[in-house]
Regions:
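Charged, low-complexity intrinsically disordered terminal segments
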Residues: 1-383
Length: 383
C-alpha cells in the first residue's frame, strides 16, 4: 500500500486549474500529463501554450491523450479546430517534447471504444494532480470534478501507471521523484488500484469478455461490505451488471445508497448516455436508492463508504469503465482524505442544481423522450 505525505483536495475548479498551470510554469526538469481528451477551447489552448513554453525552455514535456477520447471530443469540434490542435501537438514535438495517443492493441478494442481514461499530471517538484478532470472547458467551467494534489511515495505508483499506458519514463525522472518521496514523512494511507482491460481481453476485445476487472471487483467488495451508507458520484450512473447487482444487494439489506449523476441537460450533444442510465432507474428506486441529477453536470468519481472510507479517481459507474477503458481509483480512511469528500456530499445534497429523481419520474417525461428510452434502453452497453 503506497502512502502520501500530503493530500490537497481540488474540488474548486479555479483552484485546480491554477495549480495545474502553475506546475507547468514552475517546472525545472520534466512534466508528465495524461488526459482522456483535450479540447480546442480556452483551457486546452492555455495548457498547450504552457507545455510548449516549458519545452522551449528545456523542460522534458510528455503529453498522453486517449485516441478514442480525443476522437469523441473531436466530434464536437470543427474541422478547423481539430486541425489547429494537430498543429499545436506538432509544435510541441518539434521542440523535442512527446505527444502520444493511447491506442489499444487489438482492432476490436479500437473499434468499440477501448482506451485510457486516467488523468495524471506530475513534475520534478514531487507533486502529482490526480482525479477526474480532462483539459477542457467542461471540466473547469462547467461540470463538477474532483482531483487531489498528492506528494509522497504514491506518486511513484502514478508514474508506474503512466508507464503501463505506454509513456516512456526517464529513469532519472523516476530517481528524482523517489529521492523526494523518501525525504518526506508519508503517513497518509492510500489504497491504489489500476486496471487496463485492453491488456486482458481477447481478439474480440470487450465483446463477450468474461474477465474480471480488479477495480470493478474492488467497488463490488466495498458495496458488499458496507454497513450503513454508500454515497456515489458518476458522470451517468449506468454500472456494469455485476456492479449494479452489488448496489441493489446493498440497498435491499438496508444500506443507504445515494447516487449523484448528471441530468440529461448536462450533455446537450446527446441524451443517449442519460437514457442508458435511466434504463436502471426503476429497479434502483424500487430497492430504495436515492438518485440526484445535476443540471450543470456531475463528472467527479467519488464513493464514500460508511462515512469513513473515501474513494476517488477516474472510474465511472458504467460498462465502458469495466471492459473498455483503463481506470484508476484511490481510497483512504485518513481524515485528510475523508473529510473533504464528506463536505462535498453534504454540499451536493443541498445544492439547487441537484434534482431528486422521484418514483413517478417516467410519467413526467415528454412522450417523445419516454419512447426514446423504450427504444434505446436495450442498447445500454453501447452507450
Amino acid at each position: 500500500m503506497p502512502f502520501a505525505s500530503a493530500l490537497v483536495p481540488l474540488w474548486n475548479r479555479d483552484a485546480e486549474w491554477r495549480r495545474r498551470i502553475a506546475m507547468v510554469e514552475a517546472a525545472e526538469s520534466f512534466v508528465y500529463l495524461s488526459t482522456f481528451y483535450l479540447e480546442h477551447d480556452a483551457y486546452g489552448l492555455a495548457m498547450l501554450d504552457a507545455l510548449e513554453a516549458a519545452q522551449r525552455r528545456g523542460i522534458a514535456v510528455s503529453l498522453l491523450i486517449d485516441s478514442f477520447g480525443q476522437g469523441l471530443g473531436g466530434v464536437l469540434m470543427s474541422e478547423e479546430h481539430r486541425a489547429a490542435l494537430e498543429r499545436r501537438f506538432e509544435l510541441i514535438r518539434s521542440c523535442g517534447g512527446s505527444v502520444q495517443f493511447y491506442t489499444p492493441p487489438r482492432f476490436a478494442q479500437r473499434l468499440l471504444g477501448g482506451g485510457h481514461h486516467i488523468k495524471i499530471q506530475l513534475s520534478e517538484a514531487g507533486e502529482a494532480i490526480y482525479g477526474s478532470s480532462n483539459i477542457t472547458r467542461s471540466s473547469f467551467a462547467g461540470w463538477n470534478e474532483y482531483s487531489v494534489a498528492l506528494r509522497g511515495p504514491v506518486i511513484l505508483s502514478l508514474m508506474d501507471t503512466l508507464e503501463a499506458l505506454g509513456v516512456k519514463i526517464d529513469s532519472n525522472h523516476r530517481r528524482a521523484l523517489a529521492s523526494i518521496a523518501q525525504a518526506e514523512h508519508a503517513d497518509l494511507d492510500i489504497d491504489y488500484r489500476f486496471f487496463d482491460p485492453n491488456h486482458h481481453s481477447g481478439f474480440l476485445g470487450p465483446l463477450f469478455w468474461p474477465g474480471q476487472n480488479s477495480v470493478t471487483e474492488w467497488m463490488i467488495e466495498l458495496l458488499d461490505n458496507a454497513r450503513e451508507s454508500v454515497l456515489i458520484t458518476s458522470f451517468y450512473f449506468k454500472p456494469t451488471r455485476w456492479l449494479m447487482k452489488a448496489v441493489l444487494r446493498a440497498a435491499r439489506r438496508g444500506v443507504r445508497i445515494e447516487v449523484f449523476h448528471s441530468h440529461r441537460d448536462a450533455l446537450p450533444s446527446t441524451d443517449l448516455a442519460w437514457i442508458a442510465a435511466a434504463a436502471g432507474f426503476g429497479k434502483l428506486l424500487r430497492a430504495g436508492v436515492t438518485i440526484y441529477e445535476n443540471r450543470h453536470g456531475e463528472h467527479s468519481k467519488l464513493v464514500l463508504v460508511d462515512d469513513r472510507l473515501a474513494v476517488f479517481g477516474s472510474y465511472n459507474f458504467e460498462d465502458a469503465a469495466h471492459d473498455r477503458l483503463s481506470e484508476a481509483m484511490m481510497a483512504s480512511t485518513d481524515v485528510r482524505a475523508v473529510q473533504p469528500v464528506r463536505e462535498i456530499f453534504a454540499e451536493l445534497r443541498g445544492h439547487p442544481d441537484n434534482v431528486r429523481v422521484e418514483r413517478h419520474w417516467f410519467r413526467d417525461l415528454p412522450i417523445a423522450l419516454r419512447l426514446r428510452i423504450i427504444r434505446y434502453a436495450r442498447f445500454k452497453w453501447w452507450m
